[in-house]
Structures are given as C-alpha cells and as structure tokens.
Amino acid sequence: MFLYRLLNPLFFTLRSRIRWSRSGYRIVHPGVHVSYTGEARRRFDQLCMTYPEVQAWTREMDEALFRRNVLVLDWLDQFRCQTGGVHQSGSWLDIGSKNFDYAYAFRAVQVAGDDASAALSGIELDGYRVYRDGYSRYDHAMYHATRTESTYMVGDVLEAKLPSARTVTLLFPFVFAEPLLLWGLSLGAYRPQDIYDRALALTESGGELWIANQGEREAEASYELLQRCCNRNGELEISKAGRLTCEIEEYPADVYGFIVRKK
C-alpha cells in the first residue's frame, strides 16, 4: 500500500490536469442474442414487462454493455420492490458514476415510472482515467449520457454545485481506504462520512438515497455511517434492503442494499 499512497496523488493530479479526451467513441458491434434459460429467462422476461426499455437494449448495445445494465436494473428493481412501488424515482443523481455505462438502467426505471422527462445526472471524481481503447472514462460517459439524454460531470461531489434529486444512488462507495487506493485514488478522497452526508443533503424531501455495498463487512461499515447521519438528522429513516441477488447475471461479490428515506 505504500507505493499506492505515494504515487496515486501524483497520477491522479496528472490525469485531472491533462483531461485526456478524444471524439469518436461508439459501440462497434451492437446487437445481442438473448440466450437466458430457466429461472434467468423468467426473471429477464419479468424485467422486460416492467421496464419496456430493455427490449431496445438487445438491438442497440453490445453484449458487455447489455449484461452490465441488466445486472444493475435487477438490483434497482429490488430497491423499488422494497419501497412497495410507492416511490417515484423522479429526478435522479448518481454519485461515483465511473463511465456512466449503466445510465440506461436508471433511465429505464424513470420511464417505467412515467418520469421519462425527469433529469438524470452522474458525477465522477476520477473521470479522466484512460482505458485500453485509448478513450477516457469521460469519453465513454459522454457517449452514454447523450444516448440516455442525461448529464455527466467530472468533479468532487463535496465541492460541486449540484441540484437536489428525488432519487440519489451510491453504487459501491468506498467505505474503506484500501479499495480506494487500489482503484488509483489518493487518501485525500477517502471521506466516506462526508460523502454520505452530502448524498443525503442532495436528496429531496420525500426522496430516497439507495446505497449498494459489496460484502458483509462493507455493508456493516456503511450502516454505521448511515446511523451517524440519522443521529444528526431526525428526518431520515434507514431501511435495510438486504442481499441484492441477480438470477440473470453473475457478480463476483455479495451485494447488500440500504434505502434512506428523507421526510
């Protein structure tokens, strides 16, 4: 970890200053053959019925993008079921959006809730990491943002001026320092309590914050962070969504969810 602590701030600063970006990113080979069987097929058909947007994905996405969004949509659907279907997603803000390739899943939830025209935004701290294809996260994200009629920005959520949203998501936030270092960020970005507080501050009254964590240890740490938030604000109510499963696609870790409702 010593080298990560030493070099990450340097490389992150270089990426942020250079802001590597080039035009031309697109999906090269769209079109997916759906080959699910058994329980996976049953669950996929269920998602298609609830979220009609999924049908278009098979024509417009490549396989990797398709599988990614099916996985995330399955998790989002489980969050919705936990709310009893009462929560209207409305405007949406995703914090820590990476390359925003799962924006389609967010938009599908909005469309299903008659919120197709609602705002959808993503923010990512490390947006200029360069992939092997020569394009940056920003390049990928802007392509997906254009196709989903959403907005994407590179910046620090703790400092950026952002509008509040009815639904705010944190998918796999860094609650421990080691994963953050392994992903190339500096320890200066390790401020989990501040990020949770900020996410809740950006959640509208009557809205919800949805959080997904990897593994029981991260989930326990996440719950402690949320409890501290609630101890300072009597308008917050935490609900454990439990383990988020996916019968369609595989994910290498157990995923646990939390819903925080803001009165």
Indicate where each model-derived feature is located:
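Class I S-adenosyl-L-methionine
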Residues: 57-61, 217-263
